[in-house]
Amino acid sequence: MLTRLREIVEKVASAPRLNEALNILVTDICLAMDTEVCSVYLADHDRRCYYLMATRGLKKPRGRTVALAFDEGIVGLVGRLAEPINLADAQKHPSFKYIPSVKEERFRAFLGVPIIQRRQLLGVLVVQQRELRQYDESEESFLVTLATQMAAILSQSQVTALFGQYRQTRIRALPAAPGVAIATGWQDATMPLMEQVYEASTLDTSLERERLTGALEEAANEFRRYSKRFAAGAQKETAAIFDLYSHLLSDARLRRELFAEVDKGAVAEWAVKKIIEKFAEQFAALTDNYLKERAGDLRTLGQRLLFHLDDSVQGPNAWPERFILVADELSATTLAELPQDRLAGVVVRDGAANSHAAIMVRALGIPTVMGADIQPSVLHRRTLVVDGYRGELLVDPEPVLIQEYQRLISEEIELSRLAEDDVNLPAQLKSGERVKVMLNAGLSPEHEEKLGSRIDGIGLYRTEIPFMLQSGFPSEEEQVAQYQGMLQMFNDKPVTLRTLDVGADKQLPYMPISEENPCLGWRGIRITLDQPEIFLIQVRAMLRANAATGNLSILLPMVTSIDEVDEARRLIERAGREVEEMIGYAIPKPRIGIMLEVPSMVFMLPHLANRIDFISVGTNDLTQYILAVDRNNTRVASIYDSLHPAMLRALSMIAQEAEKHGLDLRLCGEMAGDPMCVAILIGLGYRHLSMNGRSVARVKYLLRHIDFEDAQTLARRSLEAQMATEVRHQVAAFMERRGMGGLIRGGL
């Protein structure tokens, strides 16, 4: 072994560059020790973390850094103790830290030794193997000797120079909620984690049943409390998330299996981990996106149960005065319990646009980025800038950059104040043209009441949300009451109710739909025409609710063909006759329109003029289908861009055909509330925009500061562009010249 050791040291010492030397080292150690994995972690004392610099056997992701904080994992423990650690099964050690990207879950045996030169820790040298065994004394001695030789070869200056490429200061992510935040990164390390729970048994099953019962009750009370809190604050969609958690927690089968596991002798924590993971894996194996998302909800339940089984609770004074939360994953419950007055922003390593957490941060107005490919522990206690407009994270930026972002935040605050000052004025262009600014709504009228004076009506009422909150289909009477509240609240303004739009990422808990390709499957009008009794009950409820107000428009979702329109109209007319027979007098006729979100209907507009009264362009799905991109898939989400030239040309074609055939034209996707898109939409001919409440003030402010001819010129130039980046540069210049760059620019 001494000969082999000398050969390795000589080869490493003769390598021209340090990174090449490290690759030689890990390869030759694997061969010499006949082990499956060898890795070198070098210590960055400025950042207080280890970087995985070279490995043979683990997966080192291309283009990204794998880092561990000094106090994290068994590698961190080796460094802190400054002595070897030899384990037969590393995954059972309390310090074990699972890093999914390196694929080390197959390996059990672990031997780590520190690399120390003149009392200065340079790094940690690690070998691993699948077999459950401790490395023998000769192997440990070999690795310790090699680490000592490596310390003599390495210098701190060499290591520091190598870190330049790993000290990422600007990290690309996905924008989840707009805005800019500057604060200290903070990871809540006190929260009990599922991966830290190991198998354990007890003889006192009655005590464990009592503990489990208490945790279930506390979690249920917590969900009810959060639901009431957010409902009282007019954040009904956020409240609905906790109603869903309560529904999952009350599942009889889940509770039965939890208690059965305890009765077999498991401690409550192990029962929670085993059963929750079992249920979550069943959901995760499904192809349907919505059902896959329920796997995450179940794990959230598990985390909360572990939290209530644990005595160590994060106190309110433990949080910094102002912080940016950094986390691997984010749950709505975690967000709800954070001190909102201290939370400046959020950075999440994993996450999707349709997750409950993403919905909630947007509702709360917290600047957020998701898919930030860096370990949260590396960001802990470091100065961060979150740019929720561009989807960027800056780590320890230079003071001049911090000053610039602070200026942008001040500008953003001032623009918001100006927008609020004018929000009750009409949405009128500088050149005099009126634009209708409508609201996208989803729950009870109380949620939208306070916006009544700011908007011109309800452009989209998502009727599926009340359906999703119940354990079965709501009755006709329940639906009448729901729709009546909205129609009467805005009795002097138009209200558009969309018929039930479920399927794909929106599922009813009592009507699960599992498909291989749900986005292109059984959803929207396809479901309700296949099951006309659901459609008839809902339309009758709408017509009855409209009998006294006469301000109803009915919107049909996911229409693909003319025959679907004809069949839906036939059923609506039938429902009208049934209602008139029921109440004994004629009722107002609603306006009928389609949600234009399937590309096929773009080419069928000439045939719709004598069948419907209006079209409402759903830009979210239309963009998705035109670009063939699943916007909730983090791997391809960056391709999704509503300002893609193909999408703009489709919108232009729709506007021209609608005007030619006398169809009332509306738009209700995210583009309607995005200041980056509004001027182009106006230039293309759109005069009816429906958006979320948080966007109303800014959009109205923007509209009052642009001229129609200028918007037309911008739209014409955008249609000539070949790439979305060209369009965005044109819009940015347009907005900057008019002093409104702060509406679209959160970063540099």
UniProtKB/Swiss-Prot annotation:
GO BP field: N-acetylglucosamine transport; phosphoenolpyruvate-dependent sugar phosphotransferase system
Stored InterPro entries: GAF, GAF-like_dom_sf, PEP-util_enz_mobile_dom, PEP-utilizing_PTS_enzyme, PEP_util_AS, PEP_util_C, PEP_util_CS, Phosphohistidine_dom_sf
Residues binding Mg(2+): E597, D621
Described function: Component of the phosphoenolpyruvate-dependent nitrogen-metabolic phosphotransferase system (nitrogen-metabolic PTS), that seems to be involved in regulating nitrogen metabolism. Enzyme I-Ntr transfers the phosphoryl group from phosphoenolpyruvate (PEP) to the phosphoryl carrier protein (NPr). Could function in the transcriptional regulation of sigma-54 dependent operons in conjunction with the NPr (PtsO) and EIIA-Ntr (PtsN) proteins. Enzyme I-Ntr is specific for NPr.
Further remark: The reaction takes place in three steps, mediated by a phosphocarrier histidine residue located on the surface of the central domain. The two first partial reactions are catalyzed at an active site located on the N-terminal domain, and the third partial reaction is catalyzed at an active site located on the C-terminal domain. For catalytic turnover, the central domain swivels from the concave surface of the N-terminal domain to that of the C-terminal domain.
GO cellular component: cytoplasm
Stretches assigned to the GAF domain: 1-127
Gene3D superfamilies named among the record's database cross-references: 3.30.450.40, Phosphoenolpyruvate-binding domains (3.20.20.60), Phosphohistidine domain (3.50.30.10), PtsI, HPr-binding domain (1.10.274.10)
Location of the active site: H356 (tele-phosphohistidine intermediate), C668 (proton donor)
Stored PANTHER family: PHOSPHOENOLPYRUVATE-DEPENDENT PHOSPHOTRANSFERASE SYSTEM, PHOSPHOENOLPYRUVATE-PROTEIN PHOSPHOTRANSFERASE
Family in the record: Belongs to the PEP-utilizing enzyme family.
Cofactor(s) annotated in UniProt: Mg(2+)
Name under which the protein is recorded: Phosphoenolpyruvate-dependent phosphotransferase system
One of the Pfam families matching this protein, by short name: PEP-utilizers_C
